[in-house]
Amino acid sequence: MGKIQKKHGKGRLDHYYRLAKEKGYRARSSFKIIQINQKYGKFLEKSKVVIDLCAAPGSWCQVASQLCPVNSLIIGCDIVPIKPLPNVITFQSDITTDHCRQQLRQYMKTWKADTVMHDGAPNVGMAWAQDAFTQSELVLQSLKLAVEFLNKGGTFVTKVFRSKDYNNLMWVFQQFFEKVEATKPPSSRNVSAEIFVVCLKFKAPKKIDPRLLDAKYVFEEVSQGNNNNEAKVFNPEVKRRKREGYEEGEYLQHKRLSILDFITDSTPIDNLGETNEMTWTPRSIKEGEVDEEEEKEKDKEARDERGNVQYVLDDKVYSDEDALKMVSKLPQTTPELLECLKDLKVLGRKEFRAILKWRLSARDLLQIDKPEAGVEVEEEELDEDQLIDKELSELGEREKARKKRERRRRNEMKQREIQRMQMNMTTPTELGIEAAKMESLFNLKQAERTGKLSELQKGKRSHVSETGDEHVTLEEAERVDYGSDDEANGLEDELESMYTEYLENKAARTAKSVVQRKKANVETEEWFGISDKKDGDESDGEMSADDVDMATIDDGEDEDDGKTARTLNNGNMFFSNPIFDNLVNAAVAKTEAKPKALDLLEPGAKDLIELEKAKKRKYAKKNGLEYSDSEDEEDDIVMETQKQDDSDIEYVHGESDSDDEPNIDLVTDQAMTMAHQLATGQTNKHKLQDDGYNRYSFRDLDGLPQWFQDDENKHNKLNKPITKEAVEALKQKMKTLNARPIKKVLEAKGRKKMRALRRLEQMKKKSELINEDGARSEKEKADDISKLMRKLAKPQKSKKKTVTVVYAGGKNKGIAGRPRGVTGKYKMVDGTMKKEQRAIRRIKKKMGKK
């Protein structure tokens, strides 16, 4: 017998058909949802609840059961029965009925679906237009169920046929989902009209317009209106193609219109947009156009027996020919206008406007817009209640307008304030106004009320007050009271305290400053001296006005004492640094020889020098040494009277060879340059002394605020030149310092070395025992010693063996034996074991408390 050839209608037995047979899928459409899932972020792997509408024969449910997480809820329904599938709930129902909705709610309880899929299609074969519309209705019903059961951020996948309702469906999808895309997977046949729409990120609106899910409203055919004649007239430069075709019966595509029809018609723009040419011929009434009602409405027009229109002007009757002659004699009827009327399709906006103005003039000439005579409008008088209501409504409207203006003004002010903040324009603009108390602003209305506008126009400089009774001259206006000295001092104190607080907050944030404060251990609180005024009975109570004045006077008297105390405290804090331990003696020795140098010191430094001399004497007496005030007279180091923030020499506090000499280290480019010049002989002691006297050395900063002094010391200082050799030397020094390992690394290396030495000692002892063993030959002894040497050289491995922990879930759930891909020791764990271990620890903790 010959082999039976099976028909391959529409290529059904293609590559995907054979793959579906091999993999056990019920239909080749399984690959469609697989490819869509891979293209759009694998949404099935993240879905706990999946609904498949029109699921027969169940191929999409098969894919969902394989890709969704374990213990996921998968529900499939169709109008035809579906064979049972593992881990899938199936039932038979029509998705357009309430029974399907009730069944879904019964299975899902209070859950929400993460993904809703729809791959249904109606029975086709009758008519293509009817089949496409039925498919669109089916898609809308599936969307209705998806909107009801989908969770926020869910996904909806549906099949749609390409038809005229496609755009309507896409618009509805976009109302419910943030992202809507149409795709055609490779497994879908090219001859098929199906496409798949993937809707991502469901919005879950609280209120849904029922019309969006109504097929009558969504697929309603909207009648196309007239052509956009306004665009043709007012924007004729833009040419639009006629994709909709042409009107029925219009074979020549060249429309002509009588000028009288254009003048009398109420839609002139439509006439200009649809007409090609206007003629000077009388218009004729078509058959069936005239009726009795129209005759009654148009009293100003009359028709003769032939049907031509007759115009009644000033009790005289004119025909179409007469009306055309009257219109042609208008001044606006120019030769240019006549040429424009011959071809309207080539005109621009300017020409169309001229034609419309000419039409209005013609209507006025023919008295078409003239109101009917004898018709008077009677105004009804309003009673008292109506007048009150009208007045109240007007007041309400005015109040609304006022509130609207006020709201607009506030919004504008807020916008300006936001703009000022964005541009960092944070300086208060009202300071000048408050200082002058609004009197420095010139107001033209106030000047007009005072009657002094003429004097201002003549150039007289005077000030106009609000009342007009006071006349302030320029000299008096310039004498402005800016406050007393006490207020200025209070402002300075406030600024000083704010700056001190700023420095404290800034220093508290840096770790270096914390370490410096711990090392220095110096009190930073300033002492402003003791006032002579007696704080007696009213120290705890409130002060009166007289007491405040007296306190202000006392503060002024004690101002010099407070300054002296502050200066003394600052000097003590400055010279308490260990840097001056050796330098004080030099200053004391030079005091007798150079008394002027001692005067350069800050107030309070003299007392500090005497204190240091006493310390030196005590130290010399304790160690049995002789101390002389002129011992350090020839010291090469010169003290600078000006305190600088950025010192070139860093004094390291730590262990040193002598208790009297600090440990000095060179850490800056300028310090290294100075040391290099001293070492090479480029400079000497006397030149350094001369360089110490410069324009920054004799600045008088007494009485100036601290923030100003800090700013001066930061910017106004001597910039000493540096050399390339000094920079390279400093870089090499820092490189050497950075190359040194830290203390912990050195300790670890030392411990490692000690362990190696101990192992070496042990090996020596074992080697001696081996050599002393007479029962062994020399070869055996050499082999044993070699083994010991290799063992010593071999790095020690950790004896702890690794154990692989495998979770007994997912693909390893219920597995017998070793899991796939696991080598070595392993341990199976699951949630129950974790709970048991937690319970054991809890019981031990309770037993320990008892």
UniProtKB/Swiss-Prot annotation:
Checking InterPro entries in the record gives: RNA_methyltr_RlmE (IPR050082), RNA_MeTrfase_FtsJ_dom (IPR002877), rRNA-MeTfrase_E (IPR015507), rRNA_MeTfrase_SPB1-like_C (IPR012920), rRNA_MeTfrase_Spb1_DUF3381 (IPR024576), SAM-dependent_MTases_sf (IPR029063), SPB1-like (IPR028589)
Quaternary state and partners of this protein? Component of the nucleolar and nucleoplasmic pre-60S ribosomal particle.
Q: Where is the composition biased (Basic and acidic residues)?
A: 388-400
Q: Which PANTHER family does the protein's record reference?
A: PRE-RRNA 2'-O-RIBOSE RNA METHYLTRANSFERASE FTSJ3, RIBOSOMAL RNA METHYLTRANSFERASE
- Protein family according to the UniProt entry: Belongs to the class I-like SAM-binding methyltransferase superfamily. RNA methyltransferase RlmE family. SPB1 subfamily.
Record HAMAP family: RNA_methyltr_E, RNA_methyltr_E_SPB1
Entry keyword Nucleus: yes
Function, as annotated: Required for proper assembly of pre-ribosomal particles during the biogenesis of the 60S ribosomal subunit.
Q: What is this protein called?
A: AdoMet-dependent rRNA methyltransferase SPB1
Gene from which this protein is expressed? SPB1
User: Which keywords appear in this protein's UniProt record, sorted alphabetically?
Assistant: Coiled coil, Methyltransferase, Nucleus, Ribosome biogenesis, rRNA processing, S-adenosyl-L-methionine, Transferase
Positions annotated as active site in the UniProt record: 159
**Where in the cell does this protein reside?**
Nucleus, Nucleolus
Q: Which residues bind S-adenosyl-L-methionine?
A: 58, 60, 78, 94, 119
GO terms for MF? rRNA (guanine) methyltransferase activity; rRNA (guanosine-2'-O-)-methyltransferase activity; rRNA (uridine-2'-O-)-methyltransferase activity
